[in-house]
Amino acid sequence: MRLYLSSYRLGDSAGALLALVGNGARAAIVSNALDHIPAAAREAYRAEISDPIADFAALGISAQDLDLQHYFGAPDRLENALRGVDLVWAMGGNSFILRRAMAQSAFDTVITELLAHDAIVYGGFSAGAVVATPSLSGVELMDDPNVIPPGYDPAVVWEGLSLVDYAIVPHFDSPHPESVAARAMANQLAKRKTPFRALRDGEVIVHIGKISDTKELAL
């Protein structure tokens, strides 16, 4: 299992990501964590601030968008799509919306199987990293679990993907609007004695191997 979990965007260790995916890699970008934001605002952000497709192209990675809504109730089609790429990259946004999308498309089941066979790399930042953990408990201090875009199941999915065995707090002590909320989440996890990793923007976790037998680097 190969994971690249970042606090913000690609982080400061893109070379480690390239080492995971290899030369000439193909990536699928999952942006469903932003489905509560109007399309025009999302397009303006990509045009004016950050375009993940361009960011990956600068690394020699060919990327395209993968909208999980197109695969709601169609796990076989989703698996076929994911088998055609080397990396799936989950963008930041609302962690609960992203987790709903992963449940309704069966991404959670498909990605676990592909990772178990080392057929793909899972990467993501902020919400994309948070959902890789065992539980989203505490994340409600950073993201609103009751924001429900059209077409989404209103039930909150609290279970994470359990790709790692600890919680992740992004934007910790960082120049980011959610830094104060991140501190509150970290404090709550510490009070509950829940294992967690707090990541500052720029920091990443590179995870190689099974959870029980893993090589992990905090970069």
Where are these regions (language model features)?
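N-terminal start-of-chain detector that recognizes signal peptides
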Residues: M1-L3, G60-I61, N94, S137-D143, ...
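Extended, subdomain-level signal for the structured scaffold at the beginning of enzyme domains
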Residues: M1-F96, A186, A190-L219
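Short, glycine/charged-enriched secondary-structure capping and boundary segments
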Residues: L18-L20, R42-A44, M102-S105, L136-E140, ...
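Short glycine-/acidic-enriched loop or helix-start segments at secondary-structure transitions
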Residues: A14-G15, A39, R99-A101, A132-S135, ...
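Conserved anion/nucleotide-ligand pocket segment
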Residues: E159-G202
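Class I SAM-dependent methyltransferase SAM-binding "motif I" and its flanking Rossmann-like core
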Residues: R100-A103, D108-S174
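A short, terminal or domain-edge coil/loop segment
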Residues: L82-M91, L114-G128, P175-Q188, L219
